Amino acid sequence: MAEFMGELRRTAYCGTLRKEDVGKEVVVMGWTQRRRNLGALLFVDLRDKTGLVQVVFDDTTDSEVFDKAQAIRSEYVLAVKGKVRERESKTNKIATGDIEILADELKILSEADTTPFEILDDTNVNETLRLKYRYLDLRRPSLQKNLFVRNEITKAARKFFDENGFTEIETPMLGRSTPEGARDYLVPSRVHEGCFYALPQSPQLYKQLLMIAGFDRYYQITKCFRDEDLRANRQPEFTQIDVEMSFVEEIEDVMYPIEGLIKGIFKSTIGLDLGEGHFRTMTYKEAMENYGSDKPDTRFGLKIVNCSDLFMASAFKVFTDALAIEIGPIRGSVRAINAKNLADKFSRKELDATVEFAKTMGAKGLCWMTWQKGGEIKSSFAKFLTPEDIENIKARMDFCEGDVLFFAADKDYVVFNTLGGLRLMIAEKHGLIDKDKYDVLWVTEFPMFEWSEEENRYMAVHHPFTAPMTEDLELCETDPSKARAKAYDLVINGQESGGGSIRIHSRDIQKKMFNILGFSEEDIEKKFGFFVNAFNYGTPPHGGLAFGLDRLTMLLTKDESIRDVIAFPKVQTASCLMSDAPAPVEQKQLDELYIEVKGE
């Protein structure tokens, strides 16, 4: 039966006690990790958020207390009063391995049923069961550590913002739906029949309005929501560290101060000094052409090389057809990567599997060329190659004995996606990535627009409030495919950790941007009227960015799953296995909201 604490009050945390505390009388409280009964001697490992400490009940313990201790089982919640003493059999497996507590008072604050799985870091239990009992899963030290790191990140962020003149301001959770990009989560209004709020995908408009209002430097750590198909490391609700600054006009005006934030976070959470200089910068064009991604992982080589000019007159129709592609601004190319010294890892079976992998990345196929050490050059398109072609490939690709080449030929974006994915797969599979390294860089000069083959029009790469580079302003109208944005992404180890832009602060340019994107005057007024109207009353140059707190925590803890750095995450069906959300509601609630649920 559960007891009350009575006069006992905690004086120490379990995992903080050390040899220097020997002789002290302490009160500790926590959960029973395990219990070992040796008859006249009883050991209990007591656990709280700081770690474990061994509690001992022996022949000097009051008989009533000793008898009570016999009832202790795993995950019972205890309050123990006793004296710290040096352990006879020390251990370096836990931080408190030099000491133990000889108990003289015990209260069993709560009993526990047998748990569905052991509360251990190395427990081999499927994630579905863990998420169903998430409150038990969160008792595991590794998950608690992740959330403590997350807390350290927000502490470091708030410290930086406070020291640099930023004001924390909350923006609305219930706003207007502007269905661009991902789908909104809609919230029906009971008061306004047939009308809906939308949960924010980001505080974008509000934070820009705060700059127009004169707050100069704003931040908040806020929830955002996107009703999109979930991928491995996406969540329907996620947390952003959101920033906006006034009187900034060039990308460095935002990037350079924010580097101080990132350096502070790395230093305070994992003790890593990222150095004094500015982070490396790479243009979008460089990133795509060399790494096949706008979030390049540069911890390893395997750079993409353009070989288009080598095959302009090729007899290989796959290549020449790709080079002939012209669809609006879209062009085709032939590009390759060299997996140096890995030819012996690619049997014919492995080569075929690699071709199949390329197809999952959107390619119609993949060509290869391999040169085994001491052997001859073999290729999937050998009959179309002349001796001169092979010599040109050797020179262009630094192709040597022991290497294997992979060629992709298609529209540029297909080639980039294919070879970008392939280089990551090869690097991961063959141990080319230094997992202890943090590679931090900015990617800049993104395109303002991208051509949609489906809609046969230009779409905004980021959002319609991003400013074009000053020298590209005219290109927005004359040749949108060449216009570059004052946009920037922070990439850490091949993960987009944050991104932002300098914003448009001119009313005329903002309207022009809407027009280029195909918005009618009616659309502009309906979706953004309140925002555009604010531009009539004096708008400072401004810009900002947002960091994904979940993603940043995952990178710093080196976890593979974003679910392991969120207290109560959703699974890939956007549902919570613990609470069974989402769930049907009563008809009365639907009636109050004027909602009718249609059957399939």
Explain the meaning of each model-derived region.
Residues 1-600:
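Class II aminoacyl-tRNA synthetase catalytic cores and aaRS-like
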